[in-house]
Amino acid sequence: MAEMFYDDDADLSTITGKKVAVLGFGSQGHAHALSLRDSGVDVVVGLKEGSKSRAKAEEQGLTVLTPFEASKAADVIMVLVPDHLQRGLYAEAIEPNLTAGKALFFSHGFNIRFGYIKPPADVDVVMVAPKGPGHLVRREYVDGRGVPVIVAVEQDATGQAWALALAYAKAIGGLRAGGIKTTFTEETETDLFGEQAVLCGGASALVQTGFEVLTEAGYQPEVAYFECLHELKLIVDLMYEGGIAKQRWSVSDTAEWGDYVSGPRVIDASVKERMKDVLKDIQDGTFARNFIEDQDAGAPKFKELRAKAEQHPIEATGRELRKLMAWVKSDDSDYVEGSAAR
């Protein structure tokens, strides 16, 4: 069983006596900065000149500096910008100011695990990663609850890295729900695998392929959309609330029987072997290398794949059908988790 941490395991004074720089003010950045401040931590936000987020942070009463200035002023530096931008930010703003005894924090271990960022030996390297989107992290904090976090220490130069990690997790409300001890390697590899094989890649491919099978068999695209994509939320919500068992308990006997007899025909042993291949590419660095090389070249392959995916017939069908659904929010103007390449 995983080792767990709760509020009583952390001393908030470990971090309230330090200045924390939160670099980035997107979904996680705003949640971390505001909750740290409300927990009594001295917070500054690091954003580039001209960033659209500067005004948002200042409106919340936060002090905004450039990433370089924020990193220089801080004892603790939390990096909350997209993975492929962290290397450049580190070289330009963090590394020149990463003096002995400081702490470098992440919410995902990608750049440490794959060696794109190599901090000096005399600083702490820590991860505090809420297992939920930023708006939920902030809402739960305000409501006196919290979103579970995972916590890791890659480098404990000061002997206080774990105490600081737990204090930070407590300050954003995470230990109200519970913190799980992990490592940078475990977090990074499992996170990437989940995204690629199940949550994003696996689910997207399954939905698209199901839609194709039905429409190629002569069924109407609108009906195929409902059966293969729209109703997925109903099933996932049941899993979210009570696991696969609750989903099976809640659906009809017909659906449950189909689950047992047909699910393994689609996701069979050969699929499991290919999932293992995906994991191997993550573990040996192949995925990270291909991703970073493409990003460094201006993301040509990434943009090509995105454009191709957006042309899939399921997208046009969905756009029309969602016009019938008054309860579905279609405006994405305030969506801040998305790609920096858009």
UniProtKB/Swiss-Prot annotation:
<dbReference type="Pfam" id="PF01450">
    <property type="entry name" value="KARI_C"/>
</dbReference>
<feature type="binding site">
    <location>
        <begin position="25"/>
        <end position="28"/>
    </location>
    <ligand>
        <name>NADP(+)</name>
    </ligand>
</feature>
<feature type="binding site">
    <location>
        <position position="195"/>
    </location>
    <ligand>
        <name>Mg(2+) 1</name>
    </ligand>
</feature>
<keyword id="KW-0560">Oxidoreductase</keyword>
<keyword id="KW-0028">Amino-acid biosynthesis</keyword>
<dbReference type="GO" id="GO:0009099">
    <property type="term" value="P:L-valine biosynthetic process"/>
</dbReference>
<dbReference type="InterPro" id="IPR008927">
    <property type="entry name" value="6-PGluconate_DH-like_C_sf"/>
</dbReference>
<keyword id="KW-0479">Metal-binding</keyword>
<dbReference type="GO" id="GO:0009097">
    <property type="term" value="P:isoleucine biosynthetic process"/>
</dbReference>
<feature type="binding site">
    <location>
        <position position="191"/>
    </location>
    <ligand>
        <name>Mg(2+) 2</name>
    </ligand>
</feature>
<dbReference type="GO" id="GO:0004455">
    <property type="term" value="F:ketol-acid reductoisomerase activity"/>
</dbReference>
<feature type="domain" description="KARI C-terminal knotted">
    <location>
        <begin position="183"/>
        <end position="328"/>
    </location>
</feature>
<dbReference type="InterPro" id="IPR036291">
    <property type="entry name" value="NAD(P)-bd_dom_sf"/>
</dbReference>
<keyword id="KW-0460">Magnesium</keyword>
<comment type="pathway">
    <text>Amino-acid biosynthesis; L-isoleucine biosynthesis; L-isoleucine from 2-oxobutanoate: step 2/4.</text>
</comment>
<feature type="active site">
    <location>
        <position position="108"/>
    </location>
</feature>
<dbReference type="InterPro" id="IPR013116">
    <property type="entry name" value="KARI_N"/>
</dbReference>
<keyword id="KW-0521">NADP</keyword>
<dbReference type="GO" id="GO:0005829">
    <property type="term" value="C:cytosol"/>
</dbReference>
<feature type="binding site">
    <location>
        <position position="227"/>
    </location>
    <ligand>
        <name>Mg(2+) 2</name>
    </ligand>
</feature>
<feature type="binding site">
    <location>
        <position position="134"/>
    </location>
    <ligand>
        <name>NADP(+)</name>
    </ligand>
</feature>
<comment type="function">
    <text>Involved in the biosynthesis of branched-chain amino acids (BCAA). Catalyzes an alkyl-migration followed by a ketol-acid reduction of (S)-2-acetolactate (S2AL) to yield (R)-2,3-dihydroxy-isovalerate. In the isomerase reaction, S2AL is rearranged via a Mg-dependent methyl migration to produce 3-hydroxy-3-methyl-2-ketobutyrate (HMKB). In the reductase reaction, this 2-ketoacid undergoes a metal-dependent reduction by NADPH to yield (R)-2,3-dihydroxy-isovalerate.</text>
</comment>
<comment type="pathway">
    <text>Amino-acid biosynthesis; L-valine biosynthesis; L-valine from pyruvate: step 2/4.</text>
</comment>
<dbReference type="GO" id="GO:0000287">
    <property type="term" value="F:magnesium ion binding"/>
</dbReference>
<comment type="similarity">
    <text>Belongs to the ketol-acid reductoisomerase family.</text>
</comment>
<feature type="binding site">
    <location>
        <position position="231"/>
    </location>
    <ligand>
        <name>Mg(2+) 2</name>
    </ligand>
</feature>
<feature type="domain" description="KARI N-terminal Rossmann">
    <location>
        <begin position="2"/>
        <end position="182"/>
    </location>
</feature>
<feature type="binding site">
    <location>
        <position position="51"/>
    </location>
    <ligand>
        <name>NADP(+)</name>
    </ligand>
</feature>
<dbReference type="InterPro" id="IPR000506">
    <property type="entry name" value="KARI_C"/>
</dbReference>
<feature type="binding site">
    <location>
        <position position="191"/>
    </location>
    <ligand>
        <name>Mg(2+) 1</name>
    </ligand>
</feature>
<dbReference type="GO" id="GO:0050661">
    <property type="term" value="F:NADP binding"/>
</dbReference>
<feature type="binding site">
    <location>
        <begin position="83"/>
        <end position="86"/>
    </location>
    <ligand>
        <name>NADP(+)</name>
    </ligand>
</feature>
<keyword id="KW-0100">Branched-chain amino acid biosynthesis</keyword>
<dbReference type="InterPro" id="IPR014359">
    <property type="entry name" value="KARI_prok"/>
</dbReference>
<dbReference type="Pfam" id="PF07991">
    <property type="entry name" value="KARI_N"/>
</dbReference>
<feature type="binding site">
    <location>
        <position position="48"/>
    </location>
    <ligand>
        <name>NADP(+)</name>
    </ligand>
</feature>
<feature type="binding site">
    <location>
        <position position="252"/>
    </location>
    <ligand>
        <name>substrate</name>
    </ligand>
</feature>
<protein>
    <recommendedName>
        <fullName>Ketol-acid reductoisomerase (NADP(+))</fullName>
        <ecNumber>1.1.1.86</ecNumber>
    </recommendedName>
</protein>
<dbReference type="InterPro" id="IPR013023">
    <property type="entry name" value="KARI"/>
</dbReference>
<feature type="binding site">
    <location>
        <position position="53"/>
    </location>
    <ligand>
        <name>NADP(+)</name>
    </ligand>
</feature>
